[in-house]
Amino acid sequence: MDCGDETLGLGSDILTQLLISRGVPVEEIAKHASPTMREFLPNPSEFRDMDRAAERIASAIVSGEQITVYGDYDVDGATSAALLIDLFSALGVEAGYYIPDRLLEGYGPSGEALVRLAEQGSSLIVTVDCGAMAHEALTMAREAGVDVIVVDHHKCAAELPPTAALVNPNRLDESDLAASHGHLAAVGVAFLLAIALVRTLRAQNYFENRKEPDLMALLDLVALGTVADVAALHGLNRAFVSQGLKILARRDRIGMAALLDASRLKRAPIASDLGFALGPRINAGGRIGESTLGVRLLTTSDPEEARAIAEQLSALNEERRAIEAEVQEAAEAQLEGQHNMSVQVLAAKGWHPGVIGIVAGRIKEKTCKPAIVIALDGEDGASTGKGSGRSISGVDLGAAIIAAREEELLVAGGGHAMAAGLTIEESKLAAFAEFLDTRLARDVERARASQAMQLDLSLAPGGLTPDLVTTLDAAGPYGVGWPAPRVAVGPVRIVKADIVGKDHLRVIASGQDGKSFKAIAFRAAETEMAQTLLHRSTARLFHLAGRVKIDDWGSRPAAELHLEDAAFAD
C-alpha cells in the first residue's frame, strides 16, 4: 500500500485536488461537482424505437386502451414500473401492473403471463428492466394479439424479439450517441421514454385542458433504481442521482418517506443510503416475500399503507440476512477446490434462490473474481438451477453468459457487464464452468492485476473529521465508476483491536499528533489484516486505509474509518 509522501491539512483544497487526481479537467470541476440534467440529458429521439414507443403509448392513452406495465422484481424493475405508473396516472390513465414471482416464474416476461394479461383486456404491455432476450414469450404475446413495448438495458443479441418497439441503449444496432448511454439502468431509460411520451402528447395538443406532469418529480425513483442496480455513476447517471437525491430529501413521495423512516434515516439521504438502506429493503420483497411490495410502496398515496409495507419490507430484509448467512457459509465451503478457476461457479440444492445474487456479490468481493451462485432443485442428476452472477470491473460477465447460452450450455441467460442471471441443467455445470474459465481467464487476470488499491488522500489522524466527510461528499454522488474516496491515515499506533458482533474488526488508533480515531472492518475477522492487527506488537506503527464515514450513533457525530487495508509504517 503506497501512502504517498505528502500529508494534507484541511486547509488545502482537498476537493479540487481529489477531482484533478481522478482526471477531471480544471474547467470541468464545477460541472462534475454539480451535474445538471440540462448538461447531460440527450435527445430521447436518438434512441432506436423511442419515438415509435412514445407514439404507440400516446395512441393507447388517447383511445382509452388498457395498458399494463410488466416489471422485474428487483429495485430497478420496481422503480421503472412505479415511474411509468405514476406518469400514466398524471396523464389521466390508470395502468395496471404485473410483477412476476421470482421463485415461481423466474426472470423476464413469461409467455403465459403475457397471454393471460391479453385475455384480461390489455392491448398494450410495456415491459421494464426485462424483455430484450425474451423471444419465445414475446412471440406468444404477438400471436395473442397484444402489442408489447420493451424498455430494457440488458445485453441484446443481434436478432431482436418481436415487439411493437424495443428501447435499449445496448441494442447492437444502436446509434453511437445512444450506445454511449449503455450504462443507464432501466429506470433511466424509462425516464427518457417519459420525456418522449410527454413531448409526443404535447404535439397532439393533449395538454390543452390538462396540466403537464412534473417529470423532475420522478427523479427520486430514477436515483434509487440507478444506484441499487449498480449502474456506473458518470455522465447522465450522475445528474440523475444528484438531482434525484434532492427530490428524495423533500419526502414528497409517501412510500419513499415511509422507507426512509423504516431505515431510521433522519438526515438527508446520500447515494450510499440508496444502495445499502433503501434498495435492500425493496429487494427483500422480491427475494423472499411478495414481488409486488416494492411497486405498491412506491405508488401508494395512503400513508398508513406505506408505513405498513415499509415495516413489512424491513422485517423481510432481516429474514433475508439470516438466510443469506447460511447460503454464504455453504458457498464459501465450496471455494476450497476452485483456487485455480478464473470464475467461481458454486451450486447446491437447498439454497434460497432469492439470496444467491447477494452471495455471489460477497464471493466476488472475497476472491476478487467473478462469481456465479446457483440454486439447484429437482432430482439428483436431473435438476435445473437458477443462478445469479456478479463480476469485477473489466470483465463482461453478461456477454459471457449470452455466449454460453448460444453454445447451448444454458437453458436461458443474460445480463450486463457487472451482473447476470441464468437457468442451467445440473448435468451441464462442469462444462459451463470450464467454458467460463477458458473464455474469461485472460480478462480476469488483467482486471485483477489492475485492481491495486488506489488512494486519493493521505492524512494525519487529526484530519479525520466530520468536516472532511462533508468536503468529500461534495464530490459525490459515489458509486460504481466513481467510488467514494479512499484515504490513508498514519503513521498510527493501534491502541486497541478486537472483534465485535459476529466477525467485525474494531480498531482504536492514535497518531503522532495525539489524535485518536475509531476504525471498523466489516466481515473481516478471519482476514490476514485482522489477524495482524489483533496480534500486533504494541511498538509497531501502521498506515491504515479505507473510506471515511460519519458515526452518528453517539451524542456527537464523529468521523470513523471503514477499514480496508493496513500496512506496517516502520
Where are these regions (language model features)?
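Hydrophobic helix-and-loop "lid/oligomerization" segment in the mid-to-C-terminal part
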Residues: D2-S123, A144-G145, P162, R199-K428, ...
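A residue-level signal for conserved active-site and pocket-lining positions in enzyme catalytic cores
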Residues: L19, V126, N283, L472, ...
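Mid-to-C-terminal polyanion-binding domains and interfaces
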Residues: S59-E65, E305-L346, G381-S383, V395, ...
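Short beta-alpha junctions and helix-cap segments that line functional grooves
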Residues: S110-A113, A134-L138, V151-H153, G357-A360, ...
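Active-site cavity-forming subdomains of large catalytic enzyme subunits
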Residues: V115-E208
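A generic local secondary-structure boundary/capping motif
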Residues: L138-T139, K155, A178-H181, K266-R267, ...
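Structural signal for conserved beta-strand scaffold positions within catalytic alpha/beta enzyme cores
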Residues: V150, L166-N168, A223, V373, ...
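Histidine-centered active-site/metal-ligand motif
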Residues: H153-H154, P169, H352, H416, ...
